[in-house]
Structures are given as C-alpha cells and as structure tokens.
C-alpha cells in the first residue's frame, strides 16, 4: 500500500504482538487501535495483522461505520488461485491457526483444497529482534521442520512479520513452492474499494503519512524503514488506550 498509493494519506498504528493472547484481549486491543484511527478521521481501515483479522475483525466491523479490510480473506483468495495441486500450507501465530480462519476461507472458495496449518510462535519475535543471519536461519529451519512431512505447493505467510523472513523461509521450503504474501492481494482489493466508493484523494491533497506504535518508537522506526524501504519514515509512540 505504501509503495503503490503514496498519494493517498496513510496512518499506521503498530500494537504489541497479539499471537499468544486470549480472544478477549485481542478484541480489546484491536478495538483500542481502531478507535485511535477513527479519531484521526480515516476513511477506510485495513487490518494488517492476521491475528486481529482472524479473531477480532467480525466483532469490530459491527461497531464501526467504516469498511474494514482484512488480510486473511485476501490471503485465502490468493492461495486458492495459486495452488495447482490443491494442497496449501499455512504458517501463522497460535491465535490465527487456532481460529482456523485460513482453512475456512480457503475451503469456502474451493472445498477440494487440503489446508495444513502450523503455528509458529518463534517467527514473529525473530523478525522483530532481527538477530544475526545464522541465528535467523537456524530458528526458521527448526520451526518449519514439520512442513517437510506434508505435500503442498503453496505456502501462505499468515503473519505480517513473516515477509521479513522470506529469504530464510524460501531457503527451507525451496524455490519450487509458491509463496503467498496476503499484502499483495490486500493492496489490489483496497484500490478497488477506494475507486468504487470514490475515496481517492486528489493529487494535490495532503499526503503526509503518520506512523504510530504502542511500543518503542526507535525500534519501530528502524523496522518500518527496512520493511518499507523508506528512510523518511518516523514512528511516534502513542497509548492507544487513551
């Protein structure tokens, strides 16, 4: 989204990791972030977190007047289109995997697709800590070991952190596997919604992008600059519960 639609003003809030939290906690924390964004007068909200999408989106959507776009639905659509053998593997947080959201969404589109889900509690912290390359590769190799025992041609990166480990993941699963990053489909769907509803900003409008985090602003800035390939990004600390 940042790359494709720089002329559209964007606000991003990054909260603490949700993957190991209870359903009630995830919904409450997600609600706080959504209310913060609503206070900024946004026109559409995107859940860039698979866990929040899987666990909280259906509840929060009933509470807000704006459309919410989630990554799970987009990732499931991309996976269903990509697989040729009808065998898909999904890696994600415990909460995402336990919700079986990808299983339901993929099989809703094609009931014949076999979906294997694997919780990966070590990968999101690994992406945030960004240790030495040999440590990253060792942790990824150990975490993805169960995938060696199944047949699949498509792998869904079911956590927004995982694209930061894409090279390490490909080194384990092999170049022959199709890697689905839901972000690509989300960007296209968001474009369609903005165009359909006449929400695109004019070319001469304010395009200042704002980035917030409930965590450490310095670390958030470093990670986001790396991820977005944009050295101009500056993160600001905020308490979304205020």
Regions found by a protein language model. Give the residues of each.
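Conserved beta-alpha
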Residues: 69-124, 185-186
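N-terminal beta-loop-helix "entrance" segment that forms/cooperates
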Residues: 10, 14-31, 125-131
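Short, flexible loop segments at boundaries between secondary-structure elements
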Residues: 76-79, 120-128, 177-198
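Active-site rim beta-loop-alpha module in soluble metabolic enzymes
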Residues: 105-173
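Single conserved hydrophobic/aromatic residue that forms the stacking wall/gate
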Residues: 1-13
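Glycine-rich, highly charged phosphate/nucleotide-binding loops
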Residues: 22-36, 135-143
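ATP/nucleoside-binding phosphotransfer catalytic cores, i.e., glycine-rich phosphate-binding loops
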Residues: 204-242
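Glycine/small-residue-rich loop that forms an oxyanion/phosphate-binding "nest" at active or ligand-binding sites
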Residues: 37-95
């Amino acid at each position: 989204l940042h790359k494709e639609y720089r002329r559209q003003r964007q606000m991003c809030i990054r909260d603490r990791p949700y993957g190991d939290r209870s359903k009630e906690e995830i919904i409450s924390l997600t609600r706080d972030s959504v209310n913060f964004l609503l206070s900024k007068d946004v026109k559409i909200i995107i859940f860039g977190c698979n866990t929040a999408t899987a666990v909280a989106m259906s509840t929060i959507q009933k509470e807000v007047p704006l459309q919410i776009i989630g990554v799970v639905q987009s990732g499931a659509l991309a996976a269903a289109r990509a697989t040729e053998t009808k065998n898909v593997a999904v890696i994600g947080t415990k909460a995402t995997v336990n919700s079986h959201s990808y299983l339901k969404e993929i099989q809703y589109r094609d009931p014949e697709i076999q979906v294997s889900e694997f919780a990966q509690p070590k990968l999101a912290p690994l992406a945030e800590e960004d240790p030495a390359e040999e440590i990253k590769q060792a942790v990824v190799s150990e975490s993805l070991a169960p995938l060696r025992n199944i047949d699949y041609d498509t792998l869904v990166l079911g956590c927004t952190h995982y694209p930061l480990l894409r090279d390490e993941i490909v080194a384990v699963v092999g170049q022959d596997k199709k890697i689905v990053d839901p972000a690509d489909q989300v960007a296209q769907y968001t474009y369609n919604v903005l165009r359909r509803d006449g929400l695109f900003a004019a070319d001469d409008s304010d395009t200042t992008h704002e980035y917030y985090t409930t965590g450490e602003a310095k670390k958030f800035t470093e990670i986001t600059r790396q991820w977005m390939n944009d050295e101009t990004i500056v993160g600001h600390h905020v308490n979304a519960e205020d």
